[in-house]
């Protein structure tokens, strides 16, 4: 894998004939990520810094953060200066059954009545929502965010007129990451609550939003010839520039450059603080600040960078793999499972939307970091009478 990615990074051109094609810099970002996963921090830093300093899109535009956070998730602004490596989707292009559209997200829309009309899967957790709470300086509290639960509409009827949105200050990225009752949901109006949720008792009151299209885009940037309008032209972004910056910040921490890491994190946070990019007409209170003083030590820096990845990249498919490579999947996920199922943990209050069916759930270190390899594939790997593939530990 390293050899393939390095070859692509060394040999691909920076500009391509068509936007969206993988170029030298997309390959470099993926190569740097692979090195980071292997804890080759100095090597990862060299590659990721090159991408950060010199990288361009396939069209030749220098990588840069978009002015508005939410534009990263809008089909009208895809293949932007922040898009580094994205799976290209298109609709209404003559293909059969929307085959070139975003089928991978088709089940992950609000449940009935809203955008996509199906199927209410991939719901954000209460733990994630709580993580967006901030202190008086607009900073997150990685250790204590679950000491207070952000108010939700668990069990509140759709026709209730008494529910109000929580008034504690939160990072403005929350409402571009999570759909919650009473807050504008793109241009669909305020999220109506339970009527857009498949089963609150099973998975809570929140809806995904980053993969969702705008109402004004229906039939134009969604496929109009199939059973669901959830097949969209919104690319699936594997790596964006903010991710590159935070991976570089992580590598800087590991090689001892804490101040450079702080600078990079603050740049990401500064974009999120652009009030023009806040959800408009929201009843929520938004606040986000900068890390104005040096981090005390490497441990504090790691904690800040890791928390920033969670907030910036929430619901984009990175979190589990980050926890595994940091070596903290077992304690983090078991703490979460205790919290969400109402078991006593860290003196946190029992969540309003606790999951009783998770009462016996447990993450086993050394096993659950990886799926089992299908037995059929192991059987087919026989060479010279010996099976080449070996089953992952614990299965």
Q: How should each PLM-predicted stretch be described?
A:
Residues 2-107, 113, 137-395:
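Acidic/polar-rich alpha-helix caps and helix-coil junctions
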Residues 108-117, 122-123:
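C-terminal cap/substrate-recognition region of VAO/PCMH-type FAD-linked oxidoreductases
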Residues 121-134:
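Acidic-aromatic substrate-binding/catalytic surfaces of carbohydrate-active enzymes
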